[in-house]
């Protein structure tokens, strides 16, 4: 999970980049922070999707088999 301080720094660097530009060190820091943020976001999204159950209008479970297998693996 990314901390509030890291998120604030990402936003600060983004704002500065639009207003005055960033130094090479700041560009490197921004890239690293964005990569950490995306990694945390993707992990969270995968965990959320593993809990989803898809049901058709008739009430039948139509969750893809791959998703069902991944969900079952996490339970054991």
Swiss-Prot record:
One annotated Gene Ontology cellular component of this protein: cytoplasm
Cell location: Cytoplasm
Basic and acidic residues composition bias: residue spans: 12-31, 63-76
Major localization class: cytoplasm
Region (Disordered): 1-31, 56-76
Family affiliation: Belongs to the UPF0291 family.
Protein name from the UniProt record: UPF0291 protein BPUM_1689
Originating organism: Bacillus pumilus (strain SAFR-032)
